[in-house]
Amino acid sequence: MIQITVVQIDNYGPWTVTPNPRRESDLQALQSRLYCDMNLQFGAHRGLAFYTRFDNIIAITNGIDLETHKRIQNSVKNRYPFTVSMAVASAETAYGAQKLATKTIQEYGSAQDDVRKEVLDVANEFVSNGYVQLAHVDINDITGKLTDLETAYDTYLSVQKTKLKLMEELKKYDSLGFFIGGDNFMCPCNGMSEKDFLCMFEDIKESCGIELKAGIGIGKTAEDASDLADIGLEVIREGKTDFQVYTLKQDVEERKDVTYNYMCPI
């Protein structure tokens, strides 16, 4: 089981234009700061957050309890000109968990409802013995094939096309995909096999002309899984395997449960 938290800014759209439209550079900086904070605060408890649309953030939160969520929510209220609502859900797949979390938060009203404020709800249960599977995907030789040859914008466009195709293919497996900078994507993919990734990469190569590779990490928390995925990708980059997908799995005895009672200082 994987645990997902959906974080949504309360009544954000109307706030950005009340009493008058706010300066765009300030809004962009504010959204970026919230994303940074969510990664620092969930990350302090071995979670991992993805910006999606910035006003909606998806976090992998295996091992993070309700009290910690509440403290993060209060921290936002104390330091930002808006509040956030959160819904937590767990499922066998990442897509299933975020779907349930999204439905839970939607039951409290519209994202632009000025009455709905600081929702914090759990759709089913907190995960105690689940696991997180993450794939760190990147483009083969983007520097030589795109960065050093094409314009910055054309390279960006190629990466975005690849991202969209990757996300669409991952959804077929009830998995998610997020752009994490450069030519890198992080993909919560509980239940997918190496064969699934190889087939998916072949389809993307045929449709986009882009070759991909992936390190897959399986661990108790998002931090554990992402660390292993990063190592797996380095194994491929360094030519230590002939395959374009490499999986590493955490030893179940390697990390004991730790109860966190601190917050990451911002």
Swiss-Prot record:
Keyword Cell wall biogenesis/degradation: no
GO molecular function: GTP binding; GTP cyclohydrolase IIa activity
InterPro entries: GTP_CycHdrlase_3, Nucleotide_cyclase, Rev_trsase/Diguanyl_cyclase
GO biological process, one term: biosynthetic process
E.C. number: 3.5.4.29
Catalyzed chemical reaction(s): GTP + 3 H2O = 2-amino-5-formylamino-6-(5-phospho-D-ribosylamino)pyrimidin-4(3H)-one + 2 phosphate + 2 H(+)
Keywords, in A-Z order: GTP-binding, Hydrolase, Nucleotide-binding
NADP recorded as keyword: no
Signal peptide span: none
Disulfide bonds: none
HAMAP family noted in UniProt: GTP_cyclohydro_3
Role description: Catalyzes the formation of 2-amino-5-formylamino-6-ribofuranosylamino-4(3H)-pyrimidinone ribonucleotide monophosphate and inorganic phosphate from GTP. Also has an independent pyrophosphate phosphohydrolase activity.
NCBIfam families (alphabetical): PRK02240.1 (NF002587)
Similarity field: Belongs to the archaeal-type GTP cyclohydrolase family.
Protein name: GTP cyclohydrolase III
